[in-house]
UniProtKB/Swiss-Prot annotation:
Its main location: cytoplasm. The record marks H176, R237 as: Transition state stabilizer. The active site is at D144 (proton donor/acceptor). GO terms for cellular component: cytosol. The keyword ATP-binding applies. It is an enzyme of class 2 (transferase). Substrate binds at R87. This is Acetate kinase. GO terms for biological process: acetate metabolic process; acetyl-CoA biosynthetic process.
Length: 394
């Protein structure tokens, strides 16, 4: 049987990220982005090998954008497209793994949409459009939350009245599960350990950030909670704050819940601390030039990250190593170094030369000779979604 092709789709409210994944090839035969959907500036960008191209699709919605994408995908796949994998942010307690898309699974995704109002409705737009355009293809949903359904109850429950959990699903769900699962499996391979008999601390650091404790291939705790706002300092998200901050701002400043939610999700984190940018690359450059806000943002980011990793270690009975992944985790030697400075009590130490080498897609071990294993592992959520989709084709 020839190698199979899976189209992976990740839909936002006005965008579609996509990748054509061939199970026998490391590089994607095709990848790209449709952005500014629903506006006169809507455009489709794609890359095939070293070639890049664009197509103006003014006013296109998700379905029309996918209809423009279809012939490009079929040409690159030589007419051999075997399935479509959709990233879905929230699966609630319904999904502990990937699921074929049908009327039942679609209804479940709709039911948990209030838990991810910024994400699930957009994911559904792409799913519904793709199912109309590709009615004969198997389509699969892969959930950010599914990997964390293995959390024990003492890790996922909030200390709030029981009825809020039983009747309204108020609990910790966690996110970035596809990435945490992929890199922990890769780390086990790199270390020569079985994935189902190894334990890892994982730091997924991008514009969104989370940590995870992975034991024997299962998530045991993670820093994000009911929503992706809980936990670490992120690009524009505050992470953990005093839960009374909402009522304090409402009483003292007269802010509405919508204003407070917007501030915590869009104006906080690295951007709020620095007053400059949510981009770690810009902040590192500004820090070099003496910018006080950028310096503070980096210090807070690294301290809070180290604190979270130390807390995650409580969920493990042994520790085989620490993994850095995501755009920041894979590319910022400074963030890795400053974070591990706070974790000396756990024995972590870096080899500066190895740490400096692991950027721009280069992974590998970066620990000092005497310290516990520390790995930079480039994530590949698209490939993991494709693998999960292929598993449901068999």
């Amino acid at each position: 049987m020839s190698a199979r092709n899976i189209l992976v789709i990740n839909c936002g409210s006005s965008s579609i990220k996509f990748a054509l994944v061939n199970e026998a090839q490391e590089q994607f035969p095709l990848s790209g982005l449709a952005e500014r959907l629903g506006s006169p500036e809507a455009i489709l960008h794609w890359q095939q090998g070293d070639e890049r191209d664009s197509l103006v699709i003014a006013g296109a919605d998700h379905r029309l954008a996918l209809s423009h994408l279809l012939p490009i995908v079929q040409r690159v796949a030589a007419g051999e497209l075997h399935g479509i994998g959709h990233r879905v942010v929230h699966g609630g307690e319904y999904f502990s793994g990937a699921s074929r898309l049908d009327a039942v699974s679609l209804q479940a995704i709709r039911q948990v949409a209030p838990l991810a109002p910024l994400h699930n409705p957009a994911n559904l737009l792409g799913i519904e459009a793709a199912m109309k355009l590709f009615p004969t293809l198997t389509q699969v949903a892969v959930f950010d939350t599914a990997f964390h359904q293995s959390l024990p109850e003492h890790a996922y429950r909030y200390a709030v009245p029981e009825a809020l959990y039983r009747e309204h699903g108020v609990r910790r769900y966690g996110f970035h599960g596809t990435s945490h699962r992929y890199v922990s499996q890769k780390a086990a391979q790199m270390a020569g350990l079985p994935a189902d008999a190894s334990s890892w601390l994982v730091a997924h650091l991008g514009n969104g950030c989370s940590t995870c404790a992975v034991e024997n291939g299962h998530s045991r705790d993670t820093s994000m909670g009911l929503t992706p706002l809980e936990g670490l300092v992120m690009g524009t998200r505050s992470g953990d704050v005093d839960p009374n901050l909402h009522s304090h701002l409402a009483r003292t400043l007269g802010w509405s819940l919508e204003q407070i939610d917007s501030m915590l999700n869009k104006d906080s984190g690295l951007l709020g601390l620095s007053g400059l940018s949510n981009d770690m690359r810009s902040l590192e450059q500004a820090r070099e030039q003496g910018h006080a806000g950028a310096t503070l943002a980096i210090e807070v980011f690294c301290y809070r990250l180290a604190k979270s990793l130390a807390a995650m270690s409580c969920a493990l009975r042994r520790l085989d190593g620490l993994i850095f992944t995501g755009g920041i985790g894979e590319n910022s030697a400074l963030i890795r170094s400053k974070t591990l400075e706070h974790l000396g009590l756990l024995g972590f130490a870096l080899d500066p030369a190895a740490n400096a080498r692991c950027v721009r897609g280069v992974g590998g071990p970066i620990q000092a000779a005497h310290g516990p294993l520390v790995l930079v592992v480039p994530t590949n959520e698209e490939r993991q979604i494709a693998l999960d989709t292929l598993a449901l084709l068999d």
